[in-house]
Structure formats: structure tokens, C-alpha cells
Amino acid sequence: VSRLEHSLQSATRAHRNGESEEMVVACLLHDIGDELAPMNHSEYAASILKPYVSEKTHWIVEKHGEFQMYYYAHHLGGDKNRRDKYKDHKYYQDTIDFCEKYDQNSFDPKYESLPLEFFKPIVKKIFSRKPYSSLTKN
């Protein structure tokens, strides 16, 4: 599937699973850096979201690329367990859950995603809210 379809599937799954609007937007945008920053796409996406999402959501998006290695690193000669360096982090399991529920399974050509238009008001709402001051002081 295309990157757009992957993102729509991810956001649709989160929405249908009752996730917060913030998480739905994070799912929609988690791979936005794939084209512009392929070597650090997670950090790129997280930096865009940072002022408008919680610390937890930011961390999940920032680290999801490393956590996704669990599913395909063995095909590239890498360490599928590299995520384990974060096993004591408070968002470790949340990031595993994100990858499992909304990323690695969102490449299904038969999945019926909601259209991009559905998500526009949610994206606008998240990006229109007052930035988190604790995250914008960096």
C-alpha cells in the first residue's frame, strides 16, 4: 500500500479502537518524515507533533521506528530486540502496543480506511490547541 494508505489505515484503526484524538493524529502523521528524513523519520514526525501532543504521545512517535525493527530487522541483518534498551522506560509497553496495533499491521490492501477528509477536523483541532509549555521550552 502507499504511504498515504498506510497512514490512513493506522489512524482509522486508532479511531475505531477508541483512541484519543491526539493518538489518532499521531497515527496519521507518524510516518510523515519517510520521504524527507528516511534515516530518522520517527524523530522528524515527533518534532512536528511535539508542541501539540503529550509527552507520552511524543515519545511513542519518536521511538516507533526503533520499536518497528522488532518486525523486520532480521531481514536486514539487524537486531530485532534493539527496543529492549528502553524496557525500563514508562512508555515502553505503550510504544510496543502502538507498533502492534497501529503500525506493523497497517499495510493491508483489503482494509477499508476512512478517507483523509474524515481526519482533517481532528488534525485541525490538535494543531489549533495551545502548545504544551513544558515541551516548547527546549
Regions found by a protein language model. Give the residues of each.
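Divalent metal-dependent phosphate-bond-processing catalytic cores, especially two-metal-ion Mg2+/Mn2+ enzymes
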Residues: V1-L8, T12-S20, P51-W59, K63-N138
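His-Asp-centered metal-binding catalytic motifs of divalent-metal-dependent phosphohydrolases/nucleases
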Residues: R13-A45, V61-G65
